[in-house]
């Protein structure tokens, strides 16, 4: 794991606004008992449930990109990948991350991933990861962001173009 530092700030408004850069379409939160305070379970149960909550009433095929929490730990990344496969099946959306460039920023990582997602929607530009070459087949409309925290917590947020 490569460590980094950073911060991001968002102004949220209820309802629709002409100034909005994106729209929060779904939010999920789940927690699970774990055996180590800084780990997730081998099947990433909390992440699976948080993604399912964020996608409630939405066809998973509508998700264009997922920004996984993916800290660069073998067990954690594998567990998150298994949870993604359970939610999306064999047709995973495009995957990307900013951690290969800035490292894992701990508490700021979810906000920085959200910022990256908003910029991708605004600019209609998918940010490639060197080891995961991919090209979007359609305009970017929906991006799912995953974040996990100490103690077995997981949050997923689906944002859409405004």
Model-derived regions: residue spans:
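Generic secondary-structure signature for well-ordered alpha-helical cores
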Residues: 16-17, 29, 56, 60, ...
């Amino acid at each position: 794991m490569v460590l980094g530092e950073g911060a991001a700030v968002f102004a949220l408004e209820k309802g629709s606004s002409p100034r909005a850069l994106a729209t929060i379409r779904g939010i999920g939160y789940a927690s699970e008992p774990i055996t180590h305070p800084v780990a997730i379970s081998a099947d990433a149960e909390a992440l699976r449930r948080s993604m399912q909550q964020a996608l409630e009433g939405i066809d998973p095929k509508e998700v264009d990109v997922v920004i996984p929490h993916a800290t660069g730990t073998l067990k954690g990344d594998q567990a998150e990948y298994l949870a993604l496969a359970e939610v999306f099946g064999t047709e995973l959306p495009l995957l990307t991350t900013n951690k290969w460039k800035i490292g894992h920023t701990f508490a700021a990582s979810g906000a920085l991933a959200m910022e990256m997602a908003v910029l991708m929607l605004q600019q209609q530009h998918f940010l490639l990861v060197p080891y995961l070459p991919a090209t979007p087949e359609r305009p970017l409309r929906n991006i799912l962001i995953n974040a996990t925290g100490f103690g077995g917590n997981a949050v997923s947020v689906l944002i859409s173009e405004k």
